[in-house]
Design a protein with these regions (language model features):
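Short, acidic, small-residue-rich periplasmic hinge/interaction motif at the N-terminus
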Residues: 28-31, 39-42, 71-75, 85-132
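Membrane-embedded beta-barrel scaffold of Gram-negative outer-membrane proteins
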Residues: 374-384, 496, 504, 537-599, ...
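A beta-strand signature from Gram-negative outer-membrane beta-barrel systems
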Residues: 91, 193-238
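Gram-negative outer-membrane beta-barrel transporters
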Residues: 238, 453, 566-569, 591-691
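Structural signature of Gram-negative outer-membrane beta-barrels, strongest in the C-terminal barrel
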Residues: 363, 412-414, 430-568, 667
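Short acidic/polar hinge/loop motifs at secondary-structure boundaries
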Residues: 58-60, 179-208
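Extracytoplasmic beta-strand/coil segments of soluble accessory domains associated
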Residues: 123, 140-179, 183
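Flexible loop and strand-edge segments within Gram-negative outer membrane beta-barrel domains
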Residues: 287-302, 306-373, 379-398, 743
Length: 765
């Protein structure tokens, strides 16, 4: 009997210890008190749940002590400690809109929601408030404000990874809601097509990311995430009107008494209609152009929809679309360094009328076992027409299936397949077809609640007409076989040393196949010939970094300081290069012109420092973003006897790069007033093609050598803004760009805008 009693007592004790306790509750927005659907709830970095349409969640946990973490994009993560007995527990949580701290939730680093402090690579996050407050008219200008990033003639460049490419190809992959949005023909970013009116946040991932995102992520990723509605409908309208000031040098002014200006309106509306999420957005913009004939008129409209099925829990489907018609003049090169700086070479600009639209059907299903199936597709159409018979049409079809699983041991597994098919018909490069298939898998695991490890693998295959990916299997110097796929991998680790101190290390490989434009374009621009290169091959590379992120808090102000040392190497790097590529007897200028070539083995090393923060010190609100980047971009195949003949510099430095970049933005608010300042700085661009400064060719492109001798220092440009909140709905702002009217160029023969002023009215209701 005694043994039986002991056995019974032991059995009851085990049952109590292993009992599964029901934990449930709801998650609300702190300001609106709306329930938040789609919040990820994680227990002890292992088990998880996702809130439903009303923000409700439930999960079962063993009795005892646990830590629950609540994560959602656009909000700061919240953590709650609980001690479960044998009864159920009701735990409700409110989430605050994310400030610039380590708790900001991001997605791009691993295709699932993580705290910024946990990611294994360098990342920057831009809030929609900064985009609006700076009176951003195209996404290009706000990306140019990110530390370590600059945009040269429409080409995004992270840590010196790219130079001047005449709009062909991109080493930075642009995503909109996790789907690539590069044009089918040129493989470039259409910045004015991106929806500034509908933003959740912008995530910039620095370093090679091809293992998770594929080709064109060789230098990094920019992910623009749009917003979905909450239970409370939201609407906003922003209207602005601006004018260009006279340039610092009077001789640059080409207009009469009436200065050119710009004006625009954009709107946003979101609401839930039963199970349907609906978002509407639109943008109208008109610019007279500070450069002669460089007009722009554009109209953009977008719709996002998502339907959440009641009968099938976890299933949602929708269609997102964006349409734009834009017309204007395309300024490429100046007509001289003085009176001609704001006038196009030859006296006139190419006039264009372009159409762009994308349609994105998608399907998502969350399983009861914490898995997620998603099918995302995109049709992206671009039509470029102009008055120089250079019509181009591109059709891109994209599909991605992805499965993601959160395991109870803290492991997150993400795997998927992608396929892309493109059709291009153009007067510039005839008719071509391209395809891209890939498969990827990534494992993210958290150990001891401090160490995060990430491993990703991808196999990529690309084909343009008959040219395709080839990977050679080697045994030493001997080739033993070849495959039609290129494997790439990434590995990263992040260790939380202290409460707000994180140390990380990462290594990632990259691979990029040339675009149709880079291989096949044949045209003339302002008297300069651009030649095709059918033998242009793919480029490969890798990047590595070692970084530390230190969080801090001063009163109610929270932020972090991030320092990273990085190194990137590229083999067969593609660059836009000047030389004698044509027939010297029949082609203009004896066959001299530009084309994309593989320049060999290159290396970029440096250090990237970023400082971000947001909060209040007493009654004063402060929002801060800034950084400094030092880069040393060199060729590992540098031959002084040959390269110094082609380059303007005698030093070993890659063309069209800076060694130093500085960025800063600070915004201070008090009661109804808000004032902000931005800064962008760089040193002198040491190396360009010698053609631009050679006296022998000065009749083709006049004034560049003279201009570089005169403006041989770096540049620092400041912007300012001041706003007043008239009431709960209406705000009025005065925005001044290039505050001190400093004259700058982004590349040879391309002078940037003079000082300009804009008045902005914004209404939210």
């Amino acid at each position: 009997m005694k043994n039986f009693s002991s056995f019974l007592f032991f059995s009851i004790a085990c049952s109590i210890l292993n009992a599964q306790v029901l934990v449930k509750g709801h998650v609300n927005d702190k300001v609106t008190n709306d329930g938040l659907p789609g919040v990820t709830v994680i227990a002890d970095s292992k088990n998880g749940a996702i809130t439903d349409i009303n923000g409700n969640y439930s999960l079962r946990l063993p009795a005892g002590k646990h830590a629950l973490e609540f994560r959602m994009l656009g909000y700061s993560a919240a953590t709650r400690s609980i001690d479960l007995k044998t009864d159920s527990l009701i735990l409700s949580v409110v989430l605050e809109t994310a400030a610039r701290s380590l708790d900001v939730v991001v997605v791009s680093a691993g295709k699932f929601e993580q705290k910024l402090g946990d990611v294994t690579v360098s990342m920057a996050v831009i809030s929609p408030q900064l985009v609006e407050n700076r009176n951003t008219t195209t996404m290009e200008s706000i990306i140019d404000q990110v530390p370590g990033v600059n945009v040269t003639d429409g080409q995004a460049n992270i840590r010196g990874g790219s130079g001047f490419t005449y709009g062909g190809g991109s080493r930075v992959l642009l995503l909109v809601d996790d789907l690539p949005l590069l044009s089918a023909d040129a493989g470039d970013v259409k910045w004015n097509f991106l929806p500034i009116e509908n933003l959740q946040q912008i995530e910039v991932l620095k370093g090679a990311s091809s293992a998770l995102f594929g080709a064109s992520a060789l230098n990094g990723v920019i992910n623009i995430r749009t917003a979905y509605p909450t239970a409370t409908p939201k609407s906003s309208v922003v209207m602005y009107s601006g004018i260009y000031d006279n340039p610092e040098r009077p001789e640059l002014k080409w207009w009469g008494d009436k200065n050119p200006g710009f004006r625009g309106t954009y709107f946003f509306h979101s609401r839930q209609i039963g199970q349907l999420d609906l978002v509407l957005g639109g943008n109208v913009y008109e610019n007279d152009g500070y450069r002669q004939d460089e007009l722009e008129k554009r109209y953009r409209f977008n719709i996002n929809t998502r339907y959440r099925f009641k009968r099938i829990q976890g299933l949602s489907a929708g269609i997102n679309t964006n349409f734009m018609d834009v017309a204007g003049g395309n300024f490429l090169l100046w007509d001289g360094a003085n009176q001609g700086a704001y006038r196009p070479l030859g006296g006139s600009s190419q006039q264009y009328d372009n159409i762009r639209f994308n349609v994105d059907p998608f399907l998502t299903y969350f399983t009861k076992s914490e898995g997620r199936h998603s099918l995302r597709t995109r049709y992206y159409y671009t039509l470029n027409t102009n008055d120089t018979k250079q019509r181009s049409q591109g059709k891109l079809y994209y599909a991605e299936y992805q499965y993601q699983k959160h395991f109870k041991n803290g492991l997150t597994w993400t795997t998927g397949l992608t396929g892309t098919y493109s059709e291009i018909a153009s007067q510039l490069y005839s008719q071509h077809y391209s395809s891209n298939e890939s498969g990827y898998t990534q494992f993210d695991k958290k150990f001891f609640n401090r160490l995060t490890v990430s491993l990703g693998l991808r196999a990529e295959s690309y084909k343009i007409d008959t040219a395709q990916t080839t990977f050679y299997l080697r045994n030493g110097k001997d080739t033993i076989g070849k495959l039609p796929v290129q494997p790439v991998m990434r590995l990263g680790a992040n260790y939380q040393v202290a409460k707000a101190t994180y140390v990380r290390a990462s290594f990632g490989q990259g691979y990029r196949f040339p675009s149709v434009a880079e291989k096949y374009i044949k045209t003339a621009v302002s008297g300069l010939e651009i030649y095709p290169n059918k033998k242009l091959g793919p480029e490969k590379g890798w990047s590595a970094e070692l970084g530390v992120k230190q969080g801090f808090q001063v009163s109610g102000f929270r932020g972090f300081l991030d320092v990273a040392a990085f190194r990137m190497e590229y083999r067969d790097m593609m660059e836009f290069t000047f030389g004698q590529w044509g027939n010297p007897n029949t082609d203009p200028l004896f066959g001299i012109g530009f084309k994309s070539t593989n320049i060999g083995h290159t290396q970029i090393t440096g250090i990237d420092i970023a400082l971000e923060g947001e909060g209040k010190i007493g009654p004063v609100g402060i929002r801060l973003m800034g950084g400094y980047t030092y880069m040393n971009p060199i060729s590992l195949d540098f031959n002084p006897a040959v390269d110094t003949i082609k380059n303007s510099s005698l030093q070993n430095i890659l063309k069209y790069r800076y060694r130093q970049l500085g960025k800063g933005d600070i915004e201070i608010s008090y009661k109804k007033f808000c004032i902000g300042f931005s800064m962008r700085g760089n040193d002198f661009m040491e190396n360009i093609d010698r053609f631009f400064v050679d006296p022998f060719y000065s009749h083709v492109l006049p004034g560049i050598a003279e201009y570089r001798r005169r403006f041989h220092h770096g540049d620092v440009v400041f912007d300012s803004r001041i706003s007043y909140q008239l009431n709960e709905m209406v705000k009025v702002s005065l925005v001044t760009n290039n505050l001190f009217n400093h004259e700058t160029t982004s590349r040879p023969a391309d002078v940037m805008p003079p000082r300009n002023f804009a008045i902005q009215f914004s209404m939210k209701f």
